[in-house]
């Protein structure tokens, strides 16, 4: 079953620009392997992300992300089953 999760989080103080680029590179590889699509927005030290794919895959990714030391204060504000992807052509994009 397809599902989507949306969350916000705060970047930790030690996060640098190169870290953001690494996050995106890692996300593209991971997401392709696991059939996950989505979007990542980063501004003013805050992340906003939507991930979509198989329910088990995005739940596993969300748990992995919530343990990543590069950000904290996670708030999941969206969690729903979906009939189609909003970001079906995207492995991951950052804006």
Segment roles from a protein language model:
Residues 1-95:
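Charge-rich, low-complexity N-terminal segments
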